[in-house]
Curated annotation (Swiss-Prot):
Tetramer of two alpha and two beta subunits. GO terms for cellular component: cytoplasm. This is Phenylalanine--tRNA ligase alpha subunit. Mg(2+) binds at residue 246.
Amino acid sequence: MKHWYDLITEAQSVEKIEEIRISLFGKKGVLAAEFARMKEASDEEKSKIAQELNIHKTTLMNELVQRKITLQTQELQEHMKSEAIDVTMFSSSSESGALHPVMQTMDRIVEYFSSMNFTVKTGTMVEDDFNNFEALNLPKYHPARDMQDTFYFKDEMLLRTHTSPVQIRTMMSSKPPIRMIAPGAVFRRDYDITHTPMFHQVEGLLVDKEGAVSFANLKFILEDFLKYMFGDVEVRFRPSFFPFTEPSAEVDISCVFCKGSGCRVCSKTGWLEVLGCGIVDPNVFEAVKYQNVSGYAFGLGVERFAMLIHQIGDLRSLFEGDIKLLEQFR
């Protein structure tokens, strides 16, 4: 057996060790043949031969394992050495990530209102009917609910259709004055060139004592905000309807594409609708058990702002993961 011990010691690769193992321990290997030859020996010799073979069997296996470990360690060290990196050398620049244009726009919106002392509030995306509708002056079977195609679960749970429930929960857990915005994802059953089933909103709320908040306050901050976002644009307020505000208004800016002269994007009107706002309806304050207060609220679609800022024609392109498109907004 000395020959096999020498072969193991001299082996220079893991593959060679495997060949030796098969030659020794295979079904037709050396040890199997030696054990088979025992049949020809006497009973006394069989015992002695079996003892010697078992000792060799154990010792050879241990030698194989140890030599294999040694060779594997050597191979690993050589491999690591061949792949060593000189950290002092100049390297080619690697691709770095960047914020999605929707998140860039969201951050810019939050930055403005944070500078105006609005706190940022977040909430759950799965809401109940009360916080999403009833507390906002939208009782069951109210026709205005048809304005929002809702994803429903069981037990009157739903995916929120706006971030207004965050305002309701904030008012129910806090006392005025309140000065907050609620950015986040919302969900509606729409999918076309200007709508997606999931999009982002930022809604704002300011509540103070009765008579302390006026439409003039709302108008001032929204005009300042829109000039911050779009530069030197004209702003106009149009009367509108929202169940949770009274009076209500839609806010338009002069078209950022044609500068108000009229184009296909603005339907030749020279104006683009960008957000809705109004004075909080007394029924909303009643739902959260507020008394002797006044306030204003507003809401905007972040994707809408991103499309106007970056002049993107199709809302759906923001969610398709097109690297060529997204790389333009680094």
